[in-house]
Amino acid sequence: MPHNNDKKRTNVSRACDQCRRKKIKCDRNQERNICTSCQRNGERCKFERVPLKRGPSKGAHKASDPELKLSSNKPSKSSLFEDSNSIIRPKSVGEDSNMDPLSRHGSNTPILDNNSNSGINDRNMGGIDDRLGGSTDPGTPSRSGSILLPPLGQYPQQQNYTNNSTSASNNMLNSTSLNSTILQQQQPFWKVPYHEFQNQRRGSIESLQSDLSVRTFNPQDQLVYNTFQQSPIAMKHSSDPTNSIPPNTKSQHLTTTSNIGSVVGANDLLSGNPNYWGSVRAGSFIPNGDENDDQIPQNLQRRSSSIPSILRNTSTSILLSQPQLPHPTNGAGSTSNNFNNTNDNSNLINNKGTGSTAGLGNNIDNAVGSASPQAQRQSQQLYSYSQFLNQSKPYNNQNFSSFGQFSTNGFQSRHGSITSEAMSPSTALGYNQNNSNNLPGANNPNISDISLLPNKESDPRVNDSQKVVKTEVSNDIFQFGEQNLANTIESNADKSEDKVKSGGKKGGKVPRKRKTKQVKESNKKLKVNKKSNFDSDSINSPKVPTPVQQIKTGFQYGQILDVELIDLYYEFIHVGFPVIPLNKQTLTNDILLVNTHPYSNIHEVNSYVILWFRNSLELLVRVALKRKNDSPFFDSHNTPGPLRSASGDENMAFNDTPKKKDITSSHADSISSGDDNGMAEVQSAFISALNECFQRVVDIHPKVRENKDRISPKIKIIYLTTFILLNYILALVGYDNSFVLGMSVTIFNEFKLYKLLVLPYKAICQDSEFSFNAKQSISLDDDFIENKNIGNGNGNRTNGSTPGEPNNDEGENALTNFNPSKEQQNSQKGGSGEGNENQGNQIRSKIGKAVNIEEETETNENYTIMFKRLYILLTMFDSLQSCLFGGPKLLNVCITNTTEKFFSGTTNSKWNIEDSLVREKGALISLKLGETLSEIASNRIIMNHFDIITLTNNNQANATDIVFNLKKLSNNRDYDNFLQENKGLELFDQQPLCISQLFHKMLIMKSSFTYQLLSLMDANNGNFVNMDLKRLEQIVESLCSLISVILQLLTLIMRLNPTNSIDLNYRPVTPTQRMEDMLSNKNTDSTDSISNSNKTNSGNDFYRRLLGLEHSNDIVYSDISRGVISPFAMAILHESHNIHELIKMTPTILIRVVMTLNVQDDTGNSVNNNATPGDHEEDMKLKRANTSQDLVYKLSNSMNDVVQIASLLSMIKPLKLFDHGFKTFESEDVLQGNDEDAKKRQRPVLKRLFYDTTNVPKPEAVDPLVVSLVNTGWNLLDDMELGFLPQ
């Protein structure tokens, strides 16, 4: 540390660092630059240790400071504000009992800058002095230089609206400047109180370790308050409460006689009042008599947080960086509020101040139809998803987040608190010393009341007075966050330039004249985008991040509008695999409409769950977005706004960047070119974002489990769906993270969801885990409850009904939409009048009982279908991970045929997974593929028979089991049964609908071909069977079909989405009415034309089909999957490569086998020589010759397809962040032969496990071609058993 020259000690006068550490004498002098000890030990004789401070503390010289003497000579309390340098940290008598321990042990006293309070004069100090109470509390001694901050009921009032009174506005401005000054000094030492509604903090999710989060407030505590707070109690003590209220809202500004709180009118929000949240942030207490058990007055209660460190960063640090939607209020012109302290299942909107409520959906248009246009726009923003289809999407206009009502800007109980939950009391906060009016967006009502601090490294406009104080935050805050990747890339060049220009000094100021070209261009962009960045409604300005953005993770959420997130999901993701197994209308108008208002007892749990569901969905969308060549992965989204679909510069996509290459272009090029460093950065950013998102969801689980009986089933569905989204991301990028999957399985099992699949319906109704009992559930007949529209054999909705529309033939929901007269008419049409009438009476009596069931109970019963679907989806992802990486399954519940039962055609169309019938079929086919993968993973031989493998005397039985399991899997007609039960899907057998359909068929054909090859060897004795023409014909047919399906699959991928990413310029086609009619068997005449137009071989029309050239009159169903991403893309690519590598030489081998059989037949040694004397031998020979010729022709075409498959595999590059590479197989040249050692090395794994060559007799004469085919079968079995990816 620096010292004066006269006081600086020479190195000779003290021991060197090494001698001091060893506590020996140092003999270094001016003649010798090294001491004897260091010279002998070969150590460096250095003096780098900073000498300890000696002498008395600074406090002993306090009286010698003239400025402090000046302050101490004035005993009056108004003298506290004469000089800012005289402000010191106060201590009260009761500090040891009431103060925070961290604040009691502060050592240094911060001194304010002289410039921070230069505008404060004596007159203003008098106004502040009046607010402080006018007299000193007897319990607090008046000492020199201390700050007596007001108690809870007397903190300064917030500046509300326009300056209607000069004195009121001046006092408020001075109060703002003073408290800003006090905040800069005192914040690290004070436990800042925050206020909330009565006793609502006791259920906070932030007190996971303890619910005792409410502490009694001591009036003697010295507190610091945010200048943006507004208290209804402070309004009482102000001289004229109406001065700060505009004239048009005076009639609506109501203050209760008990001074509990004030009700903010609807016009406050519509007029752009930035203090609309004041009643929430300042702690306006809502009457709640249920939990008002404390004897202490509510205005004397103080809330303290016992937040775990990992959750401190959750509710504010990452939340503050996202836009916020204003709190829902009453309709336009209404001033009354109806509060409900129970956990409602849907948000309700009050109609013009009356007590009636109206559901959100189509009725909301009527509720706001008579209001002004501004009120209508605001009403559309009150609720998140009820107006999804009608919400406007301005580019640089209002950018309210639809999830804003879920406290995306932090829990509403934290509003108004200076100290963030992400910071400890001893952590300094970077606070802007300028007036709040100078902050960007300070007068913008749509931006949260938080200072937007410019980044001094990325924003050249920042001067010295605006530099942010660097803080040391606990490691657990950065546990799952890294520095912003984009900011790091942009600031690296600036940092390097700063070091060079400042002579290597860190933080040196760069001269204005020596700015680089990049910095000038950055300034130019800032000037151009100044209006859009600062005047827009988005809090996420790319160049002016919040303080939280400077210290938090590199993945910044909230950069895509919530409406766009839902639209993008249902357009590009849902058809490929319904990770959210529900249609868009039900999701937006029912599931996501939950109670997240602050007066709810568990509103923070609801807000937290929905927030991270939204963030998980954004993470999925941004990872899947197609990356341009000049943009670095998903962190290149620098411009908030809607995603554009049209082409052109003005309609540039969301993740597009300007054409001019900037500093980040080299980084983007390195990533796109496969540079290891660039890919490592991308992987690091992705893993950080995924771990953070997953950790936040897991952190809330104890609170969800604790309140599982009070939490709405909607919240449970959203919470569990978040885990499905994260596992989808893992499958999409090919990331093997067993921790995410394992924890997801654990949480699903804690919800006991497996009982819904394994227990009978009546047992489920009586299980307390699902809130059912004997009175709540009416057990109808099993066939009535489990009635699916697929029961009539067609699997289609009657009359093509869609969710939300009544079904005219059968009741969509027998519990609510039952029509006795309609059923009586149906029973009369049945012919058997008496039997139908009795049956109708029985059903009518049961439904009559069910009508009296409460709505919540009925909803819980209907939600069980969602829990079943989510558990099935998790099982599918578990199976996919097992097939990819070869690990064991974690969930062993059988899900065979669950797609038809729980996903296809439920009784209530509200719960269908898709509105469109064609798109629904595409999703069902993907789910059917998940069933097949689950069956493959569950029936893996190496997992089920590992206990028998070690028995050497039972090898032949094991081989028999292998053949049996292969035969069972190859004969699995489940896919064909699925096509037969769902009439209309036979159209897709001729024309594939999606890639999942062809991949499903490829897996089944692979199993069949493997069985055909292994059947050439007798499992009992290990001998090879003789090859005949009939057996050879079966093998050739199986091989050609497999190769044809692989080529068709890869061709379809090339046409639909070769990169498996979301391209906004390549969108799916909306299904036409003709497609819907044909699929619902209304127009079966054109079925033949579709099938005939698509009967093309894979050889000649390859390039035509690759380019997607079809006749204009043909219906191309696969266009609905164009641009759609799939979680199976990684598995498809690697499995296709593995099969291609294993069978690429098989057509050549089979051609030689065919030719060998013909030669044997000509010489009379043919195996098939059982012709009767009456048969014509010439005709038989001719028939065999024709068969052989056909086989050779098919095999020749297959060889051509193999070449095309190799070309396509090199062209298809799906999105993957982790390059696992492809499996390598050693080719066995059967024509030239290999030595015995090479053959042993090439021996398949399962063959070595199940066969011991010493015990198996070797056949005398073995055809090497047949041996090669059998070894190919074993290799295919290894691929199925050990995983698609290399281990």
Swiss-Prot record:
One of its GO terms (biological process) is glucose metabolic process. It comes from the Eukaryota. Residues 456-467, 492-501 have a biased composition (Basic and acidic residues). GO terms for cellular component: cytoplasm; nucleus. Pfam families: Zn_clus (PF00172). The keyword DNA-binding applies. Residues 105-121, 240-255, 295-308, 352-365, 412-431, 665-675 have a biased composition (Polar residues). Belongs to the EDS1/RGT1 family. This is Glucose transport transcription regulator RGT1. It comes from Candida glabrata (strain ATCC 2001 / BCRC 20586 / JCM 3761 / NBRC 0622 / NRRL Y-65 / CBS 138).
